[in-house]
UniProtKB/Swiss-Prot annotation:
This is Probable neutral protease 2 homolog TRV_06370. Keywords: Cleavage on pair of basic residues, Disulfide bond, Hydrolase, Metal-binding, Metalloprotease, Protease, Secreted, Signal, Virulence, Zinc, Zymogen. Residues 1-17 form the signal peptide. InterPro entries: Fungal_M35_metalloproteases (IPR050414), MetalloPept_cat_dom_sf (IPR024079), Peptidase_M35 (IPR001384).
């Protein structure tokens, strides 16, 4: 993936695949236009439509440098399989390189190959679009103070399947191998020093928090409305069921349907990434920064090992179907999601569990 700056800056938004009602002070301040530049190549042009400089966070956005979910791809009305990564980023101690200052009426371009993160081997017509929420900071600052929204044009492309299949997959093709602890599906050969013990503790805490969250979902309608924007019986049942599924997957006595690695062997642990999931493979990988988090964080909505593990497990279709996306990070962004998006947002589950 490559960036071509129209300005001397790069940056971006947060969370793909969310169409979110905007508050008056959070109306759309950027325009995103998609264009096809090759068989499976996309150029996204991002323009600041406002009259003030925007400082945009790049994490999990259409301008993320990493093989994350930048667009939604459909064929014959069905979603094309995503083969890239769904990371959880560290949201504290953000540094300037994670942002872009985009001046009034200025634009940047970002190009990427859909075939590197989607299975386009079938070929034929596809429909591509992007929409989401972008965390923002004040100019030359790194503290998130708000967000803006975007929705791109809808782009139709005719893809040559053989040519697309020849594109190297960003996260590798063959499955990783190693010695697996069948009790939890942890690849023990990927662990060094105390990492196995740390991960086992995180899974145990994830199971405990998930069970408590399932109970809270059923007994605390005010908290359901706070995080999931509704307390109707269908949503309560779905949320509780998903938490119980995460609890089962987290339990050391489970055979497990995901494969969990103590360390990265696919090159996904970029700066700022705590852990990431490959939903196409039901695999989770911890990054070095994961081990710098506390096991549990007593600060409400603070990131820790337990809720990071919980967050990543919701990204796995073997645990939650359809698997959760990264539609909004942090309490303020989660609070801005409507009910239809909150229930599909991974951080909504981790924050709810942390807040109980």
């Amino acid at each position: 993936m490559q960036f071509t700056a129209l300005l001397a800056a790069l940056g971006a938004p947060l969370a793909l695949a969310a169409s979110i009602p905007a508050a008056a002070h959070n109306h759309s301040m950027i325009d995103v236009q998609l264009a096809a530049t090759g068989n499976s190549m996309i150029k996204a042009t991002i323009t600041n439509t406002g009259d003030r400089t925007l400082n945009l966070l790049k994490f999990n956005t259409i301008m993320d440098e990493h093989p994350t979910r930048k667009v939604m791809v459909y064929q014959d009305g069905a979603e094309v399989q995503f083969t890239g990564m769904l990371p959880r980023y560290k949201m504290s101690d953000l540094t300037p390189e994670y942002f872009v200052n985009l001046g009034p009426k200025a634009s940047v371009e970002h190009s990427f190959d859909l075939a590197a993160t989607h299975d386009l081997s079938r070929g034929g017509k596809i429909v591509v679009k992007a929409h989401g929420m972008v965390p923002t900071a004040e100019e030359n600052a790194t503290t998130i103070t708000g967000h803006t929204l975007y929705e791109s044009n809808e782009l139709t492309m005719d893809v040559d399947g053989k040519q697309a299949a020849a594109v190297e997959q960003a996260m590798g093709g063959d499955d990783s191998t190693g010695v697996i602890d069948k009790r939890s599906n942890i690849v023990t050969s990927s662990c060094r020093g105390s990492q196995l013990r740390v991960l086992q503790t995180a899974l145990s805490n994830s199971a405990r928090l998930s069970r408590a969250a399932a109970s809270a979902a059923q007994r605390n309608p005010s908290k359901m409305r706070e995080y999931f924007k509704t307390a109707d019986s269908r949503t309560v049942q779905k949320v509780a069921s998903r938490f119980l599924s995460v609890a089962r997957e987290s339990s050391s006595g489970s055979t497990g349907r995901t494969t969990y690695y103590c360390n990265d062997n696919r090159g996904g642990c970029h700066p700022g990434v705590l852990a990431y999931t490959l939903p196409s493979k039901n695999q989770v990988f911890n990054c070095p920064s994961y081990y710098q988090l506390p096991a549990l964080n007593n600060r409400c909505h603070g990131q820790d090992q337990a809720t990071t593990t919980l967050h990543e497990l919701t990204h796995n279709p073997a645990v939650v179907t359809p698997f959760c996306e990264d539609l909004g990070y942090g309490y303020q962004r989660v609070s801005a999601l409507p009910a239809s998006k909150a229930i599909q947002n991974a951080d909504t589950y981790s924050l709810f569990a942390n807040g109980m």
